UniProtKB/Swiss-Prot annotation:
Residues 68-151, 203-211, 258-268, 354-359, 404-420, 465-474 are lumenal. GO terms for cellular component: endoplasmic reticulum membrane. Adds the first glucose residue to the lipid-linked oligosaccharide precursor for N-linked glycosylation. Transfers glucose from dolichyl phosphate glucose (Dol-P-Glc) onto the lipid-linked oligosaccharide Man(9)GlcNAc(2)-PP-Dol. Disulfide bonds: none annotated. Its EC number is 2.4.1.267. Its main location: endoplasmic reticulum. This is Probable dolichyl pyrophosphate Man9GlcNAc2 alpha-1,3-glucosyltransferase. The lineage of its organism: Eukaryota, Metazoa, Ecdysozoa, Nematoda, Chromadorea. Belongs to the ALG6/ALG8 glucosyltransferase family. InterPro entries: Glyco_trans_ALG6/ALG8. It holds the Pfam family Alg6_Alg8. The gene is algn-6. It catalyses: an alpha-D-Man-(1->2)-alpha-D-Man-(1->2)-alpha-D-Man-(1->3)-[alpha-D-Man-(1->2)-alpha-D-Man-(1->3)-[alpha-D-Man-(1->2)-alpha-D-Man-(1->6)]-alpha-D-Man-(1->6)]-beta-D-Man-(1->4)-beta-D-GlcNAc-(1->4)-alpha-D-GlcNAc-diphospho-di-trans,poly-cis-dolichol + a di-trans,poly-cis-dolichyl beta-D-glucosyl phosphate = an alpha-D-Glc-(1->3)-alpha-D-Man-(1->2)-alpha-D-Man-(1->2)-alpha-D-Man-(1->3)-[alpha-D-Man-(1->2)-alpha-D-Man-(1->3)-[alpha-D-Man-(1->2)-alpha-D-Man-(1->6)]-alpha-D-Man-(1->6)]-beta-D-Man-(1->4)-beta-D-GlcNAc-(1->4)-alpha-D-GlcNAc-diphospho-di-trans,poly-cis-dolichol + a di-trans,poly-cis-dolichyl phosphate + H(+).
């Protein structure tokens, strides 16, 4: 002790005692960390949805500023003019003349070739157009009409139904899914091909696809009659919903049959059938009363227009360099039908035996692919009928579905180039980067094949022209995409049976 006192360096230490309450506050303040919102938490579903919708609307508006199909390209223009022309026809002519060739309705100039609900929808838009500016829908003289105000109206007419028909069932599905991941949720809602086709090229696919998604939601929740009515509405908006008709029919039939109560099963099926027939009659009543129903059917199912349009990634186009050497003209429609049924049969068989929700989703996607690959009069846009049900499988088959969605984006690029919207490639590439940066597992083989697809797209833009084969790059894209689609169809067909073994 004496030594310490002698040591001048040593000084007594005094400890200041803090107020206990104050010290607790200091400790709590130091230990307090910045709050981080966990978007994967179920309680934050609304925040995730709002965030995605804000990004989605920005994308739609940005896409809408780009050229539309056939912009300033007389005499036929494009799909944008087709939609405007149908408003012109329906609002100016009596209903019995909508599908008939006549003085004021030249069917060779974008004649109406979709079912009645499409016609009714365009009549409603035509009435609104007529009230805003009569020049937009003046009979004959409005052909090829283009203006900034009219383009704004048309673009909004495609965006609004997306939020009314398409998004609600899709959001309902994902927000109630136990496996819902925010990134997968975002990838599903921001799927580029639908946005580019509806808001760029210009169509109203979101209406029929939204009705289809609503059909799925109601059928899987055992509201069979409502689901059946909604599907009839989807089918009568766009006849391409026939792609989904077989799985919908098989699912309803399989779930309605009860071996222990055959009479009740028969009564249930009969009731559903009556509602379906009744809905069809109501929709078609004006054409039945005017005796023009047959003319509508002829326009809606144009078997004389060939197996495909443009350079589409269907089997018939992709392998045309072989098929055109075979004498198939007289039997091609029968071969087409047989191939569609063969491609659909495996998943449909399992669906009938095991009508689970997952198998329903698999069958909808597989059958959609089978129709796209092998059916009659296929367009690039019809790949959406396989892609949208695939969105419902993104949680279960993440790697496969993300690969598939990226290939579908590549498959429609030739259509975008035709519309002078090559900038869409940047959107597709951004989607590819995000989809593989934030999801797992990442398969190198998938990434490499997608990069090959992008290389083909770049060649289509900047590659040297070939006078002998002027469409070589478009055909390369079609072949590349078609081979992938065949693989996806086979994979889903085998996946159906694997599920059967487990169950």
């Amino acid at each position: 002790m004496k030594e310490r006192i002698k040591d001048k360096a040593w000084r007594p230490q005094f400890i200041k005692l803090n107020n206990p309450d104050t010290s607790k506050k200091i400790v709590s303040q130091k230990s307090k960390k910045p709050e981080i919102v966990d978007l994967s938490s179920p309680g934050n579903n609304d925040l995730v949805t709002i965030s995605i919708l804000c990004v989605l609307l920005c994308f739609q508006l940005a896409i809408s500023l780009n050229p539309h199909s056939g912009e300033s390209q007389p005499p036929m223009y494009g799909d944008y003019e087709a939609q405007r022309h149908w408003m012109e026809i329906t609002v100016n002519l009596p209903i019995e003349q909508w599908y008939l060739n006549g003085t004021h309705n030249d069917l060779l100039y974008w004649g109406l070739d979709y079912p009645p609900i499409t016609a009714y929808h365009h009549y409603l838009l035509g009435v609104i157009s007529n009230k805003i500016n009569k020049k937009w829908v003046e009979l004959t003289t409005s052909r090829g009409y283009e203006s900034i105000a009219h383009k704004l109206f048309m673009r909004l007419s495609a965006i609004i139904p997306f939020y009314i028909f398409y998004l609600p069932p899709l959001i309902f599905y994902f927000t109630r899914s136990k496996k819902m991941s925010p990134i997968l949720y975002a990838l599903a809602l921001l799927y580029p091909s639908l946005l580019v086709i509806d808001n760029g090229h210009f169509q109203y696919n979101s209406i029929s696809l939204g009705l289809f998604l609503a059909t799925y939601m109601f059928l899987t929740k055992n509201f069979t009659i409502i689901g059946s009515i909604l599907f009839v509405a989807a089918l009568n908006y766009k006849q391409m919903e026939l792609y989904h008709a077989l799985p919908v029919f098989v699912f309803i039939l399989a779930r309605s049959i009860n071996k222990t109560q055959l009479f009740n099963s028969f009564r249930r099926i009969l009731t559903i059938g009556l509602f379906v027939v009744g809905t069809f009659l109501i929709i078609w009543l004006p054409f039945l009363l005017t005796g023009t129903a047959k003319d509508v059917i002829i326009r809606v199912f144009p078997f004389n227009r060939g197996l495909y349009e443009d350079k589409v990634a269907s089997f018939w186009c992709a392998f045309s360099f072989i098929l055109k050497r075979l004498p198939l003209q007289s039997v091609q429609i029968y071969i087409s039908t047989a191939l569609v049924l063969a491609g659909s049969a495996p998943s449909l068989l399992v669906l009938f035996l095991r009508p689970t929700e997952k198998q329903f989703r698999i069958s909808l996607t597989a059958t959609g692919l089978s129709f796209f690959l092998f059916s009659f009069h296929v367009h690039e846009k019809t790949i959406l009928l396989a892609a949208v049900p695939a969105l419902l499988l993104i949680s279960e088959y993440t790697s496969l579905v993300i690969w598939f969605l990226n290939i579908t984006n590549i498959s429609i690029f030739s259509l975008c180039v035709k519309d002078n919207f090559a900038l869409s490639l940047s959107f597709f590439f951004a989607y590819f980067v995000v989809s593989y940066a934030y999801t797992a597992p990442r398969k190198i083989s998938h990434i490499l094949t997608i990069l090959i697809g992008f290389a083909i797209c770049i060649l289509e833009l900047y590659g040297p022209s070939n006078q002998r084969f002027p469409h070589i790059y478009q055909l390369a894209n079609a072949f590349f995409s078609c081979v992938h689609f065949i693989y996806f169809l086979l994979y889903l067909s085998f996946a159906s049976f694997e599920k059967t073994k487990k169950e």
